[in-house]
């Protein structure tokens, strides 16, 4: 309890001990928001993708990293994304389709010139084998996110420089999320 005289005050705390309850509370608020928007049973992978997509890089190269993860949580950015120029950004949630092994989905997205693009793919993986080699990846479903620009340049998820996706890199393993952030470039 923090008191200044007889008045309550706010204390500043940091670290994972404070970040965990903040993110848990934000996840609960995001779930409530989705329910009010008509998503009757929002899954945890959808909520995780929303929170990752709205995070703000706080300056430690490069995201994600052990010091800041995906950055500072911003529920405003997550639920009401706005571009750097102040325009409302379109949001698409597709969590109704199932992907069969060895197959993929292709989406064509038109992006206005000068607008950026943030994409997060997240999923709840099946439990791994308890008899698998302890040093082996336990990921059962290994999904990859790639984005190809109109001029044929391909970007892989989770490959960043200065907070933005860059070409090159290798497929990211073993994680159950992948993220891509494009500069204000013509990507569709």
Locations of regions flagged by a protein language model:
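Single conserved hydrophobic/aromatic residue that forms the stacking wall/gate
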Residues: 1-10, 179-182, 186-188
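Short glycine/serine/threonine-biased micro-segments
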Residues: 3, 13, 67-69
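Hydrolase catalytic cores
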Residues: 6-7, 11-61
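Conserved beta-strand and immediately adjacent loop positions that scaffold enzyme active sites
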Residues: 7, 142-144
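Noncatalytic accessory or regulatory domains flanking protease catalytic cores in secreted, cell-surface
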Residues: 11-16, 64, 146-181
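Acidic glycine-/aspartate-rich tracts in secreted/extracellular proteins
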Residues: 56-59, 124-126, 152
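Secreted peptidase-domain scaffold signal
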Residues: 64-141, 149
């Amino acid at each position: 309890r923090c008191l200044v005289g007889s008045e309550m005050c706010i204390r500043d705390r940091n670290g994972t001990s404070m970040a965990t309850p903040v993110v848990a509370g934000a996840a609960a608020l995001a779930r409530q928001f989705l329910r009010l928007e008509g998503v009757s049973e929002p899954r945890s992978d959808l909520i995780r993708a929303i929170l990752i997509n709205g995070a703000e890089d706080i300056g430690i190269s490069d995201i994600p990293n052990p010091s800041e993860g995906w950055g500072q949580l911003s529920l405003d950015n997550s639920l009401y994304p706005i571009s750097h120029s102040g325009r409302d950004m379109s949001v698409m949630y597709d969590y109704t389709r199932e992907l069969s092994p060895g197959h993929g989905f292709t989406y064509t997205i038109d992006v206005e010139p000068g607008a950026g693009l943030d994409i997060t793919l997240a999923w709840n993986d099946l439990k791994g084998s308890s008899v698998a080699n302890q040093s082996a990846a336990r990921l059962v479903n290994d999904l990859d996110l790639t984005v190809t620009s109109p001029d044929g340049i391909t970007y892989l998820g989770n490959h960043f420089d200065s907070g933005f996706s860059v070409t090159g890199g290798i497929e990211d393993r073993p994680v159950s999320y992948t993220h891509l952030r494009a500069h204000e470039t013509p990507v569709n």
